[in-house]
A protein has these predicted regions:
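Conserved structural core of kinase catalytic domains
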Residues: 96, 103-144
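Juxta-kinase regulatory segment immediately upstream of eukaryotic protein kinase catalytic domains
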Residues: 1-53, 238-246
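Hydrophobic residue at the +6 position relative to the catalytic HRD Asp in the kinase catalytic loop
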Residues: 166-172
Length: 247
């Protein structure tokens, strides 16, 4: 892997500068993103083996690059130039709320179209579950921690909005689940984070994993009770029902 290139040096490379305004390669937008990186305090962007900016991910809202800030590797999210809004302030607000609830990678800064968060160097949840290499008790502990994080979001009134597809939104590092990407999150009186994750775990693609871990599908009535009253008692009942808690 090539060494990181300073943000100042990126400005001198038209090929790299163009990557900052994916997919249009708009010079003005690239400079806006570059200035935002400097204001936040990002020192450098990592290059890949081809000598281009290292792309960690690409969604309909952002591209994600690997950067360096205060000497640490970070994830740099830059709004796509074709997205309806080039302002990352709303996502930063939702991410900050999640952090205060003890959920998500640390938000390190944002400015204009750029948002910088703690880098989470782990596989997505589906890959982690499918790859194996863990004891069933360890995996159940990981899933219970994920459920607890969803419960905290529910109690805090923040709905992630995309957890029914945890492949893209939950990473696992050393057995610890990390919920990422709060771009679709919203404040609502009836969040559905826990029920979304339980729906994902009940999907057909994870039938083998459920059998290995001894997990069960929750009853609709129990899900309905939790939605109406996401109390600790209802949470514990659900966890016992699906097999993540004993008793």
């Amino acid at each position: 892997m090539s060494s990181p290139i300073s943000v100042h040096e990126v400005a001198k490379r038209a090929d790299l500068l163009g990557q900052l305004s994916y997919p249009h390669g708009d010079p003005r937008y690239s400079l806006e993103a570059l200035q935002a990186l400097e204001r936040i305090g990002v020192e450098a962007i990592t290059l890949d083996k081809r000598g281009l900016l290292k792309l960690l991910g690409k969604g309909f809202r952002n591209i994600v690059l690997e950067g360096v800030m205060a000497g640490e590797r970070v994830a740099v999210k830059i709004r796509r130039s074709d997205y309806v809004s080039r302002d990352a302030s709303r996502e930063a607000t939702m991410h900050g709320i999640a952090n205060r609830l003890g959920v998500g990678p640390r938000l390190l800064g944002w400015c204009g179209p750029v948002l910088v968060v703690e880098l989470v160097p782990g596989p997505d949840l589906s890959t982690w579950l499918a790859t194996g290499g863990y004891a069933p008790a360890e995996a159940r502990e990981t899933l219970l921690e994920l459920a607890l994080q969803c419960f905290r979001l529910d109690r805090g009134g923040l709905d992630h909005g995309e957890l029914s597809d945890a492949r893209r939104h939950v990473l696992v590092v050393g057995g610890r689940p990390v919920i990422i990407d709060f771009g679709s999150a919203r404040i609502t009186p009836r969040p559905k984070n826990l029920t979304s994750i339980l729906s994902y775990l009940s999907g057909g693609n994870l039938g083998g994993v459920r059998g290995l871990l001894g997990l069960r599908t929750p009853h609709r009535e129990a899900l309905r009770r939790y939605k109406e009253n996401p109390s600790e008692e209802q949470f514990v009942d659900l966890m016992r029902m699906v097999g993540l808690l004993e008793g």
